[in-house]
């Protein structure tokens, strides 16, 4: 069964919850990443020279919004066509340049889900989590393909 209209709606609703507190949720997202993979700090220009995760950093917030937005867009693509195609072909080369490996995708996925769970609060469910996981997996597969 393909990605459903309901799954897309769940992703869209929780994405809006995430954006309601973009500064706080961005810090939370990168805190979760660094908690699991401290060495990943050097992969992000806005983190590599900072102590911990900087508060109110426009670059950090823009990158978090881009990551979550790409996953949300992937949900829309999966619903419409059943496949994720990168709108920005340079995503593969950027990830190669930064030294991103398969385990990094797992860390980011876990951080994304934990952040969304915090943002969504009582509306979070296994169904919401599953919708985001499917969309994220579609996006990560497209990025990995572009990396090879």
From Swiss-Prot:
> Which PROSITE patterns has this protein been placed in?
GLOBIN (PS01033), PLANT_GLOBIN (PS00208)
Q: Which UniProt keywords apply?
A: Cytoplasm, Heme, Iron, Metal-binding, Nitration, Nitrogen fixation, Nodulation, Nucleus, Oxygen transport, Phosphoprotein, Transport
Any single Pfam family the record assigns to this protein: Globin
What is one process in the GO biological process aspect for this record? Answer: nodulation
Q: What does this protein do?
A: Leghemoglobin that reversibly binds oxygen O(2) through a pentacoordinated heme iron. In stem nodules, facilitates the diffusion of oxygen to the bacteroids while preventing the bacterial nitrogenase from being inactivated by buffering dioxygen, nitric oxide and carbon monoxide, and promoting the formation of reactive oxygen species (ROS, e.g. H(2)O(2)). This role is essential for symbiotic nitrogen fixation (SNF).
Task: Give the quaternary structure.
Answer: Monomer.
Family to which the UniProt record says this protein belongs: Belongs to the plant globin family.
Its recorded name reads Leghemoglobin 2
Question: What is the species of this protein?
Answer: Sesbania rostrata
